[in-house]
């Protein structure tokens, strides 16, 4: 009775029961009885299984062609279905079956301009809520999802294509996104193209661009080039790729090359002497304009325009990645990144495996995740993350043995995996990865077995700090000399620590948090290699075992961990001048035993994903 006042019975007749009153008083709150009437016991119940089980049964009915009331004819394929299911999932079908269209009365409906297999996949999704987007179907699946107005599948296809972006295909993906009005994918493809222009200009796709799209690209202020010479060379290569067709378009395209920003030597010696430039009056005029700009600095304020505006400098900054770990009683695969320029934590692509006790480091601007524990098994697999594509790859060779609570660092172009445990014993084994050979090789073992060890690289040496020998936490420290392939014992820490955080900051090694024999630690200390001594540093505000430690844009940051009671997502930053730690926001996920890594990224890169 929407919109009408509620009426309640207050006159209870002699001998009436609560049910009598309820049936007589048909208006009012049906769940509330009048005063004086005993309230019956109630237990609201919502089934989590019901939607899934109902969908499973309806899908079985479809497969057995039971209660189907429509047949979709797509090419040579006939697909049996239920109008109500199609209408519930697709605005396209809802309009078709509930309006006055002829199809609303037909039992067979012909669907044109759609791929048979794509339609099958989308109908399967309507009945199962599951679909697999892959390289072989995305180009037919996205147009089909657009036609049927399945926004969720459109987003999934675009997300898949975002992860496939590469300098060799970004222009094709951009055109595909433009055709199907995928604005977010178009934006990201544009950003990717601008940032990777030096590689994109070498691709076949670049050479096949129509003139208007080439102009769109080279007109961008955010084009990432070392100098305007690269833009000019790219344009001339594009023209000469199909010279008869494109020669007349050269003046139009050259207008968007910022010739006044070229060096005088290049402008005169290369641009001005090029036969294609010399033979065209409009091109010669553009060269003369640039010469005047360079030769008459006093007149430059009067000559400002799009061609004299410098490309925006590409700002570089460091971005912190938090990888895997243990959260809410289970290993996790999630990864997030912190950008100091925006002061924001954002989720990025997850690893293919859950990893706690994972070793993380950065080599050649790629983030490596080594070993760990997935909640049931010890791992020797390795994954590699490319921030340019927001994609993890698993084609990295595995370590020779399973390792969790492993220390990982980069020295001399190699990735080192130090210690850890394999599920049977604590390890002193050390091996290093050569990315050129995709191969791990054993090097000298440590003198002590160490799990929960922290590692750092300083002065050409690899340091293994603390950890546990499988029985007790350690305060001992070893240093590896790659020239000698030997480990040497150095001064011990003041405190025994396992599962600590370690990083190099201001030419000293900082060791923070961890756990001793009895409790999680908030204390910190640092090592001076010049004196071979450890000295105490002010304690963090929280106890943190399984903490990550990293230096980001000159700031020492302690990330996550466990305080003895709670998994932490908070961050602390060390202020060396004030000799204090201060809280600095928090991650999206609580993380114990996760890894951290820092990658220097351009401003453009850091805002793509």
UniProtKB/Swiss-Prot annotation:
Keywords: Actin-binding, Cell projection, Cytoplasm, Golgi apparatus, Kelch repeat, Nucleus, Protein transport, Repeat, Transport, Ubl conjugation pathway
Major subcellular location class: cytoplasm
Domain named BTB: residues: 68-135
Domain BACK: 170-272
UniProt superkingdom: Eukaryota
InterPro entries xrefs: BACK, BTB-kelch_protein, BTB/POZ_dom, Kelch-typ_b-propeller, Kelch_1, SKP1/BTB/POZ_sf
Signal peptide (UniProt feature, chain positions): none
Factors inducing expression: By hypoxia.
Pathway(s) where this gene product acts: Protein modification; protein ubiquitination
Subcellular location: Cytoplasm, Perinuclear region; Nucleus; Golgi apparatus, trans-Golgi network; Cell projection, Axon
Reported impact of residue 111 to A: In KLHL20m6; abolishes interaction with CUL3
Record note on what altering residue 150 to A does: In KLHL20m6; abolishes interaction with CUL3
Start-end of each Kelch repeat: 319-365, 367-413, 414-460, 462-507, 509-554, 556-601
GO terms under cellular component: actin cytoskeleton; axon; Cul3-RING ubiquitin ligase complex; cytoplasm; cytosol; dendrite; Golgi apparatus; perinuclear region of cytoplasm
GO molecular function, one term: type II interferon binding
An example Gene Ontology biological process: protein ubiquitination
Function: Substrate-specific adapter of a BCR (BTB-CUL3-RBX1) E3 ubiquitin-protein ligase complex involved in interferon response and anterograde Golgi to endosome transport. The BCR(KLHL20) E3 ubiquitin ligase complex mediates the ubiquitination of DAPK1, leading to its degradation by the proteasome, thereby acting as a negative regulator of apoptosis. The BCR(KLHL20) E3 ubiquitin ligase complex also specifically mediates 'Lys-33'-linked ubiquitination.
Assembly mode: Component of the BCR(KLHL20) E3 ubiquitin ligase complex, at least composed of CUL3, KLHL20 and RBX1. Interacts with PDZ-RhoGEF/ARHGEF11, DAPK1, PML and CORO7. Interacts with F-actin. Interacts with IFN-gamma (IFNG). Interacts (via kelch repeats) with IVNS1ABP (via kelch repeats); this interaction blocks the assembly of CUL3-KLHL20 complex.
Record's protein name: Kelch-like protein 20
């Amino acid at each position: 009775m929407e919109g009408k006042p509620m009426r309640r019975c207050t006159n209870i007749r002699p001998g009436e029961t609560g049910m009598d009153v309820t049936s007589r008083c048909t208006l009012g709150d049906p769940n509330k009885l009048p005063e004086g009437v005993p309230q019956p016991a109630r237990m609201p119940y919502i089934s989590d299984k019901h939607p899934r089980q109902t969908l499973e049964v309806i899908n079985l009915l479809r497969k057995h062609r039971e209660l189907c009331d429509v047949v979709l004819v797509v090419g040579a394929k006939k697909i049996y279905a239920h109008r109500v299911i199609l209408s519930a999932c697709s605005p396209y079908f809802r309009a078709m079956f509930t309006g006055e269209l002829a199809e609303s009365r037909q039992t067979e409906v012909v669907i044109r301009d759609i791929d048979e297999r794509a339609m099958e996949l989308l109908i399967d999704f309507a009945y199962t809520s599951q679909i697999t987007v892959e390289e072989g179907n995305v180009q037919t699946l996205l147009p089909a999802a657009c036609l049927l107005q399945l926004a969720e599948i459109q987003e999934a296809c675009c997300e898949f294509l975002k992860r496939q972006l590469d300098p060799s295909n970004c222009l094709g993906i951009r055109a595909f996104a433009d055709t199907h009005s995928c604005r977010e994918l178009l934006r990201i493809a544009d950003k990717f193209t601008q940032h990777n222009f030096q590689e994109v200009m070498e691709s076949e796709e670049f050479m096949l661009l129509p003139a208007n799209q080439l102009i769109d690209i080279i007109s961008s202020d955010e084009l990432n080039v070392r100098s305007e010479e690269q833009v000019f060379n790219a344009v001339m290569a594009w023209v000469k790729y199909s010279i008869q067709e494109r020669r007349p378009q050269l003046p139009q395209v050259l207008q968007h090359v910022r010739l006044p920003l070229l060096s005088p030597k290049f402008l005169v010696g290369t641009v001005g002497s090029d036969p294609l430039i010399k033979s065209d009056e409009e091109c010669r005029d553009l060269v003369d304009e640039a010469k005047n700009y360079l030769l008459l600095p006093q007149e430059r304020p009067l000559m400002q325009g799009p061609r004299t505006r410098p490309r925006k400098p590409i700002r570089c900054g460091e971005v912190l990645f938090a990888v895997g770990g243990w959260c809410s009683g289970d290993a996790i695969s999630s990864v997030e990144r912190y950008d100091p320029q925006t002061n924001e934590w954002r989720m990025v692509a997850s690893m293919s495996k859950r990893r706690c006790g994972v070793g993380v480091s950065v080599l050649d601007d790629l983030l490596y995740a080594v070993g760990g524990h997935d909640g049931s098994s010890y791992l020797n697999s390795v994954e590699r993350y490319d921030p340019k594509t927001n994609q993890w790859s698993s084609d990295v060779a595995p370590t020779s043995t399973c390792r969790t609570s492993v220390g990982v660092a980069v020295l001399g172009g190699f990735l080192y995996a130090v210690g850890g445990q394999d599920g049977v014993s604590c390890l002193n084994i050390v091996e290093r990865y050569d990315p050129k050979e995709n191969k791990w090789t054993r090097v000298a073992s440590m003198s002590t077995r160490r799990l929960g060890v922290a590692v750092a690289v300083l002065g050409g040496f690899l340091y293994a700090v603390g950890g546990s020998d499988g029985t007790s936490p350690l305060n001992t420290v070893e240093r590896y000399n790659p020239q000698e392939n030997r480990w040497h014992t150095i001064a011990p820490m003041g405190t025994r620590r396992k599962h600590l955080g370690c990083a190099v900051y201001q030419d000293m090694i900082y060791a923070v948090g961890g756990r001793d024999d009895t409790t999680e630690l908030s204390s910190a200390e640092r090592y001076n290699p010049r004196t071979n001594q450890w000295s105490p540093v002010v304690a963090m505000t929280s106890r943190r075992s399984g903490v990550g430690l990293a230096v980001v844009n000159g700031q020492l940051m302690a990330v996550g961990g466990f305080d003895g009671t709670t998994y932490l997502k908070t961050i602390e930053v060390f202020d060396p001048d004030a000799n204090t730690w201060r809280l600095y926001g928090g991650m999206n996920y609580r993380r114990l035993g996760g890894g951290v890594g820092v990658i220097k990224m351009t401003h453009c890169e850091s805002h793509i994903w």
